[in-house]
A protein has these predicted regions:
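Short connector loops at secondary-structure junctions
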Residues: 12-18, 142, 217-223
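Intrinsically disordered, low-complexity segments enriched in small residues
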Residues: 3-5, 29-220
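Short Asp/Glu-rich motifs
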Residues: 18-19, 74
Length: 227
């Protein structure tokens, strides 16, 4: 009755709610906020549930934070000297960098043509280990228009991330001691149709063990498309 469209997803941008560049949005999901700011070039802060709901009712949100140009400038230059072979490696990279920059705005250089899903994973990890709501990738994301003049400080902090940092992130996040598993769950953030297709490709001609549950978490629209 109030005009709401229930999406039930942490990735509304995969379900038709895709903000345009410079569009002001109010979302309460940290991984969605960093995606909107970084990949889409929209304007969003990390909202709480009550403030996002208030914005949906009033159509207004406080003008501060990442809604302002001056706060969207990078604080740190991140050099990458690690092999990023899979989407999981981007998660490990984001986890490592997020712990270092906290709530900063990292500028990544040396990243070779990442996919949207890889950037989605990078942003989600940055937002979880730190409080990153915006990042830039040189030559890739819409506001990363070169190093010159795009930093808050005259001499921003330069951070080199090597293979050891990525490996350490895997170690920190992999504390399982048992060799067997009961449940395998993928889809945090929710899987895109490309990620669902990749799982299907990996399982082609194979069967999941009857003692193991495989969960693929995604949105209703993506599931309908996959079906």
């Amino acid at each position: 009755d109030m005009g709401a469209v229930p999406l039930h997803s942490c990735c509304p941008y995969l379900c038709g709610n895709t903000p345009r560049p410079n569009e002001q949005v109010a979302w309460g999901e940290s991984s969605a906020v960093v995606f909107a700011n970084s990949i889409l070039g929209a304007r969003a802060n990390r909202e709480g549930g009550p403030s996002a709901l208030a914005s949906s009712i009033t159509g207004k949100s406080p003008l501060y934070g990442y809604r302002l140009n001056r706060n969207r400038r990078s604080t740190d230059i991140i050099g990458i000297d690690a092999k990023l072979r899979s989407i999981t490696d981007f998660g490990a990279l984001g986890y490592s960098v997020g712990k270092i920059v906290k709530d900063g705005v990292p500028f990544f250089k040396g990243m070779s043509d990442p996919s949207v899903d890889e950037l989605k994973m990078l942003g989600a990890a940055l937002a979880s280990s730190g409080a990153v709501a915006l990042f830039h990738v040189d030559g890739v994301t819409p506001e990363a228009d070169g190093i010159s003049g795009y930093f808050k400080e005259d001499k921003p902090q330069e951070i080199e991330i090597g293979q050891k940092h990525v490996d350490e992130a895997y170690y920190m996040l992999s504390k399982a001691t048992e060799k067997s598993v009961d449940v395998v769950c993928v889809g945090c953030p929710h899987c895109s149709i490309q990620e669902v297709a990749e799982v299907a490709r990996l399982l082609r001609g194979k069967r999941v063990d009857s003692h193991i549950a495989l969960w693929i978490c995604t949105s209703s629209p993506v599931k309908a498309l996959a079906d």
